[in-house]
C-alpha cells in the first residue's frame, strides 16, 4: 500500500478527511498523520503541537497499513 492507495481506501471506507493528514501540508493538529522523515515513515497523532503517539516504520507499505488499521478501528468505536 502507498499514500495514494491509502487515500482511496480511507475514502471508500468513509473515513472523514478531517481525521487524517497524508501530505504533511496544511492542518495536522488533532488528526493522525503520516510523513517520511530521514528515510523512515512516521505515523503520529498531533495534539496541541505535541506528538502524543508516534510509530516509526521502514516502509511506506507498513506505515500505510498501520494507519489504515488505526483509523478503521477508531471509526468502529
Task: Give the role of each language-model region.
Residues 30, 75-76:
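Residue-level signature of transmembrane alpha-helix interfaces in integral membrane proteins
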Residues 37, 76-77:
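Intrinsically disordered, low-complexity linkers and terminal tails enriched in Pro/Gly
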Residues 25-52, 70:
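Short aromatic-glycine-(Arg/Gly/Cys) micro-motifs in beta-strand/loop hairpins
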Residues 1-26:
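Negatively charged, low-complexity tracts enriched in Asp/Glu with abundant Ser/Thr
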Residues 53-57:
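A short, polar/proline- and glycine-enriched secondary-structure boundary/capping micro-motif
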Residues 16-18, 42-43, 66:
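Intrinsically disordered, low-complexity segments enriched in small/polar residues
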Residues 4, 58-74:
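A short, charged, amphipathic alpha-helix used as a generic interaction element across diverse proteins
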Amino acid at each position: 500500500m502507498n499514500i495514494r492507495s491509502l487515500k482511496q481506501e480511507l475514502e471508500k471506507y468513509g473515513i472523514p478527511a478531517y481525521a487524517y493528514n497524508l501530505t504533511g501540508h496544511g492542518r495536522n493538529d488533532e488528526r493522525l498523520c503520516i510523513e517520511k522523515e530521514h528515510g523512515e515513515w512516521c505515523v503520529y497523532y498531533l495534539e496541541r503541537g505535541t506528538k502524543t503517539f508516534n510509530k516509526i516504520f521502514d516502509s511506506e507499505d507498513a506505515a500505510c497499513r498501520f494507519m489504515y488499521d488505526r483509523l478503521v478501528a477508531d471509526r468502529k468505536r
